[in-house]
Regions:
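Sec-dependent signal peptide recognition
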Residues: 2-10
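Hydrophobic h-region of N-terminal signal peptides that target proteins for export
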Residues: 10-18
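Phosphate-end processing signature that detects enzymes handling 5′-triphosphorylated RNA
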Residues: 19-295
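Cytoplasmic C-terminal tails of single-pass
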Residues: 296-301
Length: 301
């Protein structure tokens, strides 16, 4: 239908930083049933120096005062949302200082089973600043970025020229790193206080994310990665047996934002029907107007 439609419309109109990274982002998320539960769990981690995790002892290292400002992009048809993917421009601040800017593209590894996300990144050069969406678009279309894995993957999901800003997200993050005896971070637990914004509408959201180290997951063999996933899953389940204080969620922050802000995704079929109707109406006008004119002239004669 798409090919037919394009040809059809053409007929009517003629008549009238390099350095992207590929990682596996595996996280488990809990939504607190109320704000109190969120802060109670965070407090329990603040007061601990070490934690026993599936028979292993990990040192807890806290990182706080992180602020993320994210702008999400998609097409008018919300093609990325429908394909369980997301694209964002992220600015990261630590203690109020801009520390890192990057573009992130995430895709679900399996469309049926939720087993993690593929993550592709392009780090923004310190000298580059985005004031408008056009700046973002120009940057991602630079020659060096077109050779990145992010660009190649994104292009396979969506027509990049059709991307538009969807909404803004600000989130305050308190993060706890679980490190082994060698000082290597194996797991990360993040407490996120999120505000979704679109025009004058604002919605709050609290979520706790439990993640394995992205780099370790990307390089690990299947046995090791399965063991890490199993340990993390059991740890999260034991935190709240019976889901008394929290609900397990599988929605990405982008999907949550779409729902909380009430942005209804459009479907290609509806758009195509409208365009086809317009095309047919134009065809009728092209053929009927001359016909009526000839009839009128003949009638006068």
């Amino acid at each position: 239908m798409n090919i037919f439609l394009k040809v059809f419309l053409m007929f009517i109109l003629s008549s009238v930083t390099f350095g992207a990274e590929n990682r596996i982002d595996l996280d488990l998320r809990l939504e607190p049933k109320n704000e109190k539960n969120f802060y109670l769990l965070k407090g329990s981690f603040i007061n601990k120096k070490v934690i026993l995790f599936e028979g292993n002892t990990y040192k807890i290292v806290r990182s706080q005062n992180e602020l993320f400002v994210d702008e999400y992009y998609d097409t008018v048809l919300q093609s990325l949302f429908n394909k369980k993917a997301s694209l964002r421009y992220r600015k990261r601040f630590v203690d109020g200082v801009d520390s890192k800017n990057l573009i992130q593209f995430k895709t679900q590894i399996d469309n049926v089973k939720i087993i993690g996300m593929n993550e592709f990144k392009i780090e923004i050069n310190s000298g580059d600043t985005f004031v408008t969406y056009r700046d973002f678009k120009n940057y991602i279309n630079r020659s060096k970025n077109k050779n990145s894995e992010l660009y190649k993957q994104l292009r396979s999901y969506v027509n990049i020229s059709k991307l538009e800003p969807m909404f803004l997200v600000t989130q305050h993050r308190d993060r706890f790193y679980l490190q082994d005896n060698d000082g290597k971070t194996i797991y990360t637990i993040s407490f996120d206080e999120v505000i979704y914004s679109k025009q004058l509408l604002k919605k709050t959201y609290f979520v706790i994310e439990f993640e394995t180290n992205e780099t370790i997951m990307a390089s690990a063999d299947k046995i090791t990665s399965d063991a890490l996933v199993k340990s993390l899953n059991e740890f999260v389940l034991n935190l709240d047996e019976g889901n008394v204080l929290f609900n397990r969620t599988y929605d990405s922050k982008y999907a949550v934002g779409i729902k909380k802000l009430g942005i209804e995704p459009k479907t290609e079929n509806i758009i195509e029907i409208i365009l086809i109707f317009f095309a047919l109406f134009s065809i009728i006008l092209l053929f009927c107007v001359p016909m009526f004119y000839r009839i009128k002239v003949n009638h006068k004669m």
